[in-house]
């Protein structure tokens, strides 16, 4: 008794092997760009929300005051700082909401739709971030140096903590600007080399 079974071929022509998985499309670097995009978005979220939180909590009251007058410096005393806090919070919110689109770009690196959507909105929010950072930087400069022509005195000699917080918030916003510029450039590279 034999334990092997012989099965003859059904036809005279030998069949070839079929490829079950299509070979990967060229341009695997796009997946690396998409991963870098996701990581940069996380960094921009930290910079934008950190700038908004730092500026939003900047408040200092001097320890001396009179019966009718108390000396206080707060972000809500300056409309440029209010604009800064609102804008940086919006930018941080947008960046959080853009993470799923960035994740789709990782899964489907050759899809142009999510990439085009991100580059348009990244450019809009880059503009907002730059505008709010520049307006806050102008006020921080005046707080540090004053302006003799308009009788604006430098207040950072008295309100050192307030000025340190607002300065660090402005620096953090410009870190977010640099990261957003990198995101726009990465998206443009991924879209351009089709």
From Swiss-Prot:
Compartment(s): Cell membrane
Membrane topology: Multi-pass membrane protein
Alphabetical list of PANTHER family matching this protein: CASP-LIKE PROTEIN, CASP-LIKE PROTEIN 1U1
Subunit structure: Homodimer and heterodimers.
Chief localisation class: membrane
Protein name according to UniProt: Casparian strip membrane protein 2
Keyword entries, A-Z: Cell membrane, Cell wall biogenesis/degradation, Membrane, Transmembrane, Transmembrane helix
Keyword Membrane belongs to the record: yes
Spans traversing the lipid bilayer: 33-53, 83-103, 116-136, 169-189
